[in-house]
UniProtKB/Swiss-Prot annotation:
Protein name: Phosphoenolpyruvate-protein phosphotransferase
Single annotated GO MF: kinase activity
Active site: H189, C502
Cell compartments where the protein resides: Cytoplasm
This protein's encoding gene: ptsI
GO CC list: cytoplasm
Remaining remarks: The reaction takes place in three steps, mediated by a phosphocarrier histidine residue located on the surface of the central domain. The two first partial reactions are catalyzed at an active site located on the N-terminal domain, and the third partial reaction is catalyzed at an active site located on the C-terminal domain. For catalytic turnover, the central domain swivels from the concave surface of the N-terminal domain to that of the C-terminal domain.
Principal subcellular localization: cytoplasm
Keywords: Cytoplasm, Kinase, Magnesium, Metal-binding, Phosphotransferase system, Sugar transport, Transferase, Transport
Protein species of origin: Haemophilus influenzae (strain ATCC 51907 / DSM 11121 / KW20 / Rd)
PANTHER family: PHOSPHOENOLPYRUVATE-PROTEIN PHOSPHOTRANSFERASE
Enzyme Commission numbers on file: 2.7.3.9
Length: 575
């Protein structure tokens, strides 16, 4: 039994299909001057074949994964057809008198190495994209066979060192039951795409390809993060029972799909979903989300070579708003920086990127980016119920400046004869202690708050949750964090405004009743968590939750708060 990083939840039973990479063997013998033209021709033939394959993969991804995920392969095609890359490879071929395969491998390997050595998790994982492109190009130059994962004929759990984005997009979902890899993280494209496909996946096991052979029977328990290799009969029975239990729970929860999140004593809140692309709207709809509480627009800006145009953004936002069919969609403006970088934006290397030039700070400095995005948002507001919010706000001055920009853009759109919602709601993310402490002033300036507990916790406790030495100190249930949350909620209510939450805490069942009792108006989370949170809210009295919250806010430690919640859940048979 092995474990790794839980990338996409679910349980799968089946035979392993281990993807063994056909090793690329390069002929390093020098070529002669009269062979150079032939090798240049081989390069172009190989590249043309790779481009044709990627175009086919992109079309398949567009159908099965949606426009945003298909854009990954637009990025791959742009790299593959990049004139500077072509020039580098051919210059290396001619000057070093090596064949096309060696030249392409050498130049692309240099790029992979450079990205892998950068101290940035997002860019490190993009090295896998370049590796994918390199393998495809070199194999085509050498005339090697490339496995078509869309042609798998038997039900299988795929086992691989890694699955590239192009391989993941090709998967025959009627036959592929799940995926296990040696490497990868939760933010890798493989993980993101597995979640979009609702395909059980565990990545980053380090050794699964060494321990598993094709034909071995596997249980992929992507609930408890375990992979069983040739399990015993009792293990199979145990996991089958778990699978049946999960199926029963899903069937029961599905009955809540069209029911409101309303307590036993009639207090109504909204349970909504976080999304990153139009594709995610399917999951939101399927799980009964009452709207979109966080549309992460930065995915539109990633995996491409240039900024998305106003028109591209407008189309993307309009699609989501129309898909939600009258339910509120809250768009967060581009939250780039920190752990999310863009190759084309030339962000500075900073000692403390999470405290640096990021999110709204970039937008206020780069007005062309801000204006294009806000114009697109305003135009999309003519097609449904839409609100906009700004990340990383610390002051009243910032929000006043942003509101002035919105009014200027509204005037422009009126002059152009374009339609928009003149009363579009404007809100801010409360994810800095400054915004939380100043909530009573900010509440006078905006229509709503959305609390981002991930960053608020990190900044309040001065804890980098990615630092293994101190990550145990990261706790959104810390009394100081809860005190700030309560302060924000009360400040909004004092001005007749509402407060939502879109951080991980919003989808944490142990925190639900506490947040409910504190007066939170909207819970926004991964779509898959919506039914459970809705069920919990529908099985409790708001007044009881309020007493729980009032008591918890008097406790000096997170442990005491946790104990109080545990006792409440037991007493009310909510465990």
């Amino acid at each position: 039994m092995i474990s790794g990083i839980l990338a996409s939840p679910g349980i799968a039973f089946g035979k392993a299909l281990v993807l063994k990479e056909e090793k690329i063997v390069l002929d390093t013998q020098k070529i002669t001057d009269d062979q150079i033209d032939a090798e240049v021709a081989r390069f172009y033939e190989g590249r043309n074949a790779a481009v044709e394959q990627l175009n086919s993969i992109r079309e398949r991804a567009l159908i099965s994964l949606g426009e945003e995920k298909a854009a990954i392969f637009e990025g791959h095609l742009m790299i593959l057809e990049d004139e500077e890359l072509e020039e580098e490879i051919l210059d290396y071929l001619r000057s070093n008198k090596v064949n096309a395969g060696v030249a392409a491998s050498k130049i692309l390997d240099q790029q992979v190495t450079m990205l892998s050595e950068i101290d940035d998790e997002y860019l490190k994982e993009r090295a896998g994209d370049i590796r994918d492109i390199a393998n495809r190009l070199v194999k085509n130059i050498l005339g090697m066979y490339i496995v078509d994962l869309g042609d798998i004929q038997e039900e299988s759990i795929l086992v691989a060192y890694d699955l590239t984005p192009s391989e993941t997009a090709q998967l025959n979902l009627e036959k592929v039951l799940g995926v296990v890899t040696d490497i990868g993280g939760r933010t890798s494209h493989t993980s993101i795409m597995a979640r979009s496909l609702e395909l059980p996946a565990i990545v980053g096991t380090n050794k699964v390809t060494k321990l598993v052979n094709t034909g071995d029977y596997l249980i992929l328990d992507a609930i408890n993060n375990q992979v069983y290799i040739n399990p015993t009969a009792s293990q199979i029975d145990e996991l089958k029972a778990l699978e049946a239990k999960i199926s029963e729970e899903k069937a029961e929860l599905a009955k809540l799909k069209d029911l409101p999140a309303i307590t036993l004593d009639g207090h109504k809140v909204d349970v909504v979903a976080n999304i990153g692309t139009i594709r995610d709207c399917d999951g939101a709809e399927r799980n009964g989300a009452e709207g979109i509480g966080l549309y992460r627009t930065e995915f539109l800006f990633m995996d491409r070579e240039q900024l998305p145009t106003e028109e591209e953004q407008f189309i993307a936002y309009k699609q989501v708003v129309e898909a939600m069919n009258g339910r509120l969609t809250v768009i967060r403006t581009m939250d780039i920086g920190g752990d999310k970088e863009l190759s084309y934006l030339d962000l500075p290397k900073e000692m403390n990127p999470f405290l640096g030039w990021r999110a709204i700070r970039i937008a206020l400095d780069r007005r062309e980016i801000l204006n294009a995005q806000l114009r697109a948002v305003l135009r999309a507001s003519a097609f449904g119920k839409l609100a906009v919010m700004f990340p990383m706000i610390i002051s009243v001055e910032e929000i006043r400046e942003l509101k002035a920009v919105i009014e200027t853009l509204k005037a422009e759109l009126r002059e152009e004869g374009r339609l928009f919602d003149n009363n579009i709601q404007v809100g801010v993310m409360v994810e800095t202690p400054s915004a939380a402490v100043n909530a009573k002033f900010l509440a006078k300036e905006v229509d709503f708050f959305s609390i981002g507990t991930n960053d608020l916790t990190q900044y309040t406790l001065a804890v980098d949750r990615g630092n293994e030495f101190i990550s145990h100190l990261y706790n959104p249930m810390h009394p100081s964090v809860l005190g700030l949350i309560k302060q924000v909620i009360d400040a909004s209510h004092a001005e007749g405004k509402w407060t939502g939450m879109c951080g991980e805490l919003a989808g944490d069942e142990r925190a639900t009743l506490l947040l409910l009792g504190m007066g939170l108006d909207e819970f926004s989370m991964s779509a898959i968590s919506v039914p459970r949170i809705k069920k919990l809210i529908r099985n409790v009295n708001f007044q009881d939750a309020k007493v729980l919250a009032d008591t918890a806010l008097q406790k000096p430690t997170a442990a005491e708060i946790d104990q109080l919640i545990e006792e409440f859940l037991l007493e009310n048979s909510l465990n």
